[in-house]
Regions:
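Feature primarily recognizes SF3-like P-loop helicase cores of small DNA viruses
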Residues: 1-238
Length: 238
C-alpha cells in the first residue's frame, strides 16, 4: 500500500491543482533505509530545473521565492525542534486548492503564486517535528515510515541512477496511481499509515493519549480535577 500511495503522489504532482490537499513526509530514524532513494527518484523524474529544495524550516521570508515555477519542492531534512515562524501556515497555504501564496523576494516586488502555480511538497526526516504541529497539518500529511535499516551487504550501489532508464515505466505507474487517486477521491492509506499517524499525534500531545486511554466520559459521575491531574503526572513519569 505504501507503493500505491507513492505512485498516487507522483501522479498527483502531474496535476495543475491541489484538490487533494496533501503533502508527503517520509520518516525513518536511520539514514540508511531508502528515503533518499525515493527523493532521488522524484527529483530525477521531474528534472532538476522543475524541483526546489527548501526545507520546511525555510518556508518563510524571501526564501519562498525558490518555489516559483517548480513542479515539486523536495526537502531532505526537517528540524526536529519544531516550526514556529509561520512555516506551517505557509505549508497549509501551499497545499490548499484555493489559497494564493504571498511571495516577498529579496530586493524585488512582492507577488502571489496562484493555486495552479504552487508546487507539490515532499519531505524526509530522521526525526519528527513536534512544535506547533496541529490537526490541520496532520490531516494533510501522507506519512510513510521507513523502519528497516539496510545493511551495507544488502545495499545496491547506484540504485538511484538505475531508475533513469526506467522513467517510462515510472510514468506509467504514476498515471495509474493518478487514475486510482481520482477514482477513490483520496489517497490510499494503509492501516499502518493510519496507526503511525495516530502515534505521531500522541507524541506531539501526550495529554491526548492520556485522555483517550484513561478517561471515560460519564455525565453521572464527577472526578476532582486535582485527582485527574495527579493521575496524569503519574502517567507522564511512568
Amino acid at each position: 500500500d505504501d507503493q500505491k500511495t507513492l505512485m498516487e503522489f507522483m501522479g498527483y504532482c502531474l496535476l495543475p491543482n491541489h484538490n487533494y490537499e496533501s503533502f508527503l513526509f517520509l520518516y525513518g530514524r536511520s539514514g540508511a533505509n531508502g528515503k533518499s532513494v525515493i527523493l532521488d527518484v522524484l527529483r530525477s523524474f521531474f528534472g532538476d530545473e522543475n524541483v526546489s529544495s527548501l526545507q520546511l524550516q525555510q518556508f518563510c521570508g524571501h526564501e519562498l521565492h525558490a518555489l516559483s515555477n517548480k513542479i515539486i519542492n523536495i526537502g531532505s531534512e526537517i528540524d526536529k525542534l519544531g516550526i514556529d515562524n509561520g512555516q506551517l501556515s505557509n505549508l497549509k497555504a501551499l497545499v490548499s486548492p484555493k489559497d494564493r501564496l504571498q511571495i516577498n523576494p529579496k530586493n524585488q516586488d512582492p507577488y502571489s503564486l496562484e493555486p495552479s502555480e504552487k508546487p507539490k511538497l515532499a519531505f524526509a526526516g530522521n526525526d519528527k517535528p513536534k512544535g506547533n504541529m496541529d490537526n490541520a497539518v496532520f490531516r494533510r500529511m501522507l506519512l510513510i515510515s521507513f523502519d528497516k535499516e539496510i545493511t551495507d551487504d544488502k545495499k545496491i550501489r547506484g540504485l538511484s541512477d538505475r531508475f533513469d532508464d526506467e522513467k517510462g515505466g515510472i510514468l506509467n505507474m504514476a498515471l495509474l496511481g493518478l487514475e486510482r487517486l481520482i477514482k477513490q477521491g483520496s489517497f490510499t492509506k494503509s492501516q499502518k499509515m493510519r496507526d503511525e499517524l495516530e502515534a505521531y499525534k500522541d507524541e506531539v500531545s501526550p495529554l491526548r493519549a492520556f485522555v483517550r486511554d484513561y478517561l471515560i466520559v460519564d455525565e453521572n459521575y464527577k472526578t476532582p480535577s486535582a485527582y485527574v491531574r495527579g493521575l496524569y503526572l503519574s502517567w507522564c513519569e511512568n
